[in-house]
A protein has these predicted regions:
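Histidine-acidic metal/acid-base catalytic patches
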Residues: 70, 119-226
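A short, flexible beta-alpha/helix-coil linker loop
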Residues: 6-11, 43-46, 80-84, 169-172, ...
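A generic structural signal for short
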Residues: 13-14, 50-51, 88-89, 111, ...
């Protein structure tokens, strides 16, 4: 399960930045035997790391919260007006990540960058960040929409440069859209990747549980055949 820290700021804090809420998440995780495998700085959809001076604060707060939740991967999103479009923006972001990386290393948290740029551009940013704690959070849906060969990119990046995956093909159910998931799961398995892949699939409010079960059942079946 991936936890979003929310976007609405109250008294200078993100919604989950509350000891009682953190404790409740930990309790529910233990109670239902569902690990908190990652977190997300959702606030970066409002204050993007590519240029907003407020962004580093939210990332630093999120590193602390990720550690408190006993998790290891913090998703750093770059979408909408904050999507990376120019080399200058990518260079700035790589430098910003380099400044944030020491705190992530200290907390043993991976900063996973999720965006709409190519695998090659992502690697250039990682190399600019100069930290083993800055990796790619690979979203097969986003990269497909951006026109990239996702199987080729996954194999090229390798398990050393990918921290986690998002599996989705919105607005479709998995297996009913553009993406052929069998080659994707084959590629992930061939890497020897042993981390987490989260379903970030659309679901209808009135059929939420059924939709989640349908997508999970499908991807498990594909994994068994991979």
């Amino acid at each position: 399960m991936q936890i979003s820290f929310g976007r609405k700021i109250v008294d200078g804090k993100m919604p989950v930045d509350n000891p009682e809420i953190v404790a409740r998440y930990l309790q529910l995780s233990k109670q239902h035997s569902i690990p908190i495998d990652g977190t997300c700085v959702d606030r970066l959809h409002d204050n993007g790391l590519k240029s907003d001076k407020l962004a580093p604060k939210w990332v630093l707060d999120s590193i602390r919260l990720t550690k408190e939740l006993h998790s290891k991967v913090l998703l750093i999103p770059f979408f909408g007006p904050w999507a990376l479009r120019t080399q200058a923006e990518m260079d700035y972001t790589g430098d910003a990540l380099r400044e944030l990386a020491p705190e992530a290393e200290k907390a043993r948290v991976i900063l996973g960058i999720e965006d709409t740029i190519s695998a090659e551009d992502n690697v250039r940013m990682i190399e600019r960040a100069r930290s083993k704690n800055v990796l790619v959070y690979y979203d097969v849906g986003n990269s497909t929409l951006a026109g990239f060969d996702i199987v080729k990119e996954i194999r090229w990046l390798g398990k050393e440069r990918i921290c986690q995956f998002h599996l989705k093909d919105n607005p479709n159910y998995l297996g009913e859209g553009k993406i052929e998931f069998a080659p994707v799961m084959h590629a992930i398995r061939d890497l020897g990747f042993s981390g987490y892949a989260n379903l970030e699939t659309d679901a209808h409010p009135e059929t939420l549980v059924a939709d989640m079960r349908r997508n999970l059942t499908y991807i498990r079946r594909v994994m068994q055949r991979a």
